[in-house]
Amino acid sequence: MDDLETLDFRELERELANALAADQKYSRENDAKFRAIHQKVASYEEFRDIVLASNLKPLERKDKVGGESKQPWNPSFNTTNCTQKSEDVMLKKSLSDPTNAFEFARDWRRLGNVEKYDFLLQLGAEKLSQLFHAEVCSGLLGEFLLVLSESFQAIHVEKVLKILQTLAETKRFDLNLIFISRSEVESSQKLFGKLQTCVGAMKDEKRGLGDENLRKLMACYKISC
């Protein structure tokens, strides 16, 4: 009984630490965004670099610059097959249900584009709304549009529309939309082109509602008809 209580306490402590880290990361990135805007950066890439740099840990006196490192460039290179299998199992478990934006971003970075598409559909609009109740940063927003465009399947049209609607309702959406890259803008245009085709092929009773929702979404995402 004592061991169980200790284990529960440690799990609670871990979740609290993760939530605190996520809040701190959000605060740093948010400050960096406004700093970049005030600096009037010349490009999206420069804006993104400033936001990403907000999470870098500064060097300390004991850190050596240019010195020989004893740690290999790829620490996981020598892991055994058994360890790799164990990590794969842990990854699948962790992908099942992230509890906050920090855990989502951690899992997201481990996936390929097709897996990312499946991950978004698996979570669905309601779960994404819970994870990103604060905002979806421009980096993730652009990646979402890119992934949805590249892997889109007609059978998922309603799920994708709901996901896009959820993203459009997040805080500072208009600001984050401004800073997505040119390639991500093009992907967004292609995605909505595919959605238009799918909605146009719907039966009459669904097409009217689908057309109306799609027009509103296109206006939100600054897509011209």
Curated annotation (Swiss-Prot):
Give the location in the cell.
Cytoplasm; Cell projection, Cilium, Flagellum
Name the coiled-coil region(s): 8-32
Which organism's genome codes for this protein?
A: Xenopus tropicalis (Western clawed frog)
Gene for this chain: dnaaf19
Pfam families under this entry? Dynein_attach_N (PF15867), RPAP3_C (PF13877)
Under the cellular component aspect of Gene Ontology, which terms does the record hold?
Answer: motile cilium; outer dynein arm
Instruction: State the source organism's domain of life.
Output: Eukaryota
Instruction: Name the principal localization, coarsely classed.
Output: cytoplasm
Please report which protein family the annotation says this sequence is part of: Belongs to the DNAAF19/PR46b family.
Protein name (Swiss-Prot/TrEMBL)? Dynein axonemal assembly factor 19
- For whether the record's keyword set contains Cytoplasm, the answer is yes
Keyword set for this entry?
Answer: Cell projection, Cilium, Cilium biogenesis/degradation, Coiled coil, Cytoplasm, Flagellum
Upper lineage is: Eukaryota, Metazoa, Chordata, Craniata, Vertebrata
Q: Does the keyword section mention Cytoplasm?
A: yes
